Regions:
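Metzincin-family zinc-dependent endopeptidase catalytic domain
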Residues: 1-102
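Metalloprotease/metallohydrolase-associated module, dominated by Zn2+-dependent proteases
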Residues: 60-96, 112-152
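Active-site recognition of the HExxH zinc-binding catalytic motif
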Residues: 99-111
Length: 152
């Protein structure tokens, strides 16, 4: 459920993933700029990272325990002025801006960059690639098969 707007500075977002109430911290999506967030310098339009936990899950078949990383919270930072420029000046601006958000959201849940320029997870991006490619979808599918972590 969305919690609404916050004035919390991105630099002060805590690495703590559980609050006093035992709930996982919400994902923070920040519209910011390179002055406030230096990691958005040059042509970096966004970045994201998930807060990862290691959980142990027993195998349903042989009882062995596997250690798995799961993502429970995190942050997405988007360069508002650069996104506005994409929207205003690119013929395919809306699709390109949405592609940036998709790319960063995929990082949030655990996807990494790939070398294939036809995939949305390529770090260089392309005005021609505005949706997840087959490799992106395979990665998301694999992540979706992982274990869930309870609230408390």
């Amino acid at each position: 459920e969305p919690l609404g707007r916050t004035d919390t500075a991105l630099s002060t977002v805590s690495e703590t993933v559980k609050g006093a109430d035992g709930r996982w911290s919400p994902v923070v999506i920040a519209w910011t700029n390179p002055t406030a967030e230096p990691r958005l310098a040059d042509d970096v339009v966004g970045f994201a990272g998930g807060t990862r936990l290691e959980v142990q899950t027993p195998s349903a078949t042989d009882g062995t325990v596997q250690q798995t990383d799961v993502y429970v919270s995190g942050v997405i930072a988007l360069d508002g002025p650069q996104i506005a420029g994409i929207l205003d000046y690119s013929p395919n601006g809306r699709a390109e801006a949405v592609a940036v958000v998709k790319h960063e959201a995929a990082h949030l849940v655990g996807l990494d960059h790939v070398d294939d320029p036809s995939e949305i997870m390529n770090p260089r991006g392309s005005a021609l690639v505005t949706d997840f490619g087959p490799g992106d979808l395979r990665g998301l599918n694999q992540l979706g098969r992982g274990p869930c972590v309870p609230e408390a």
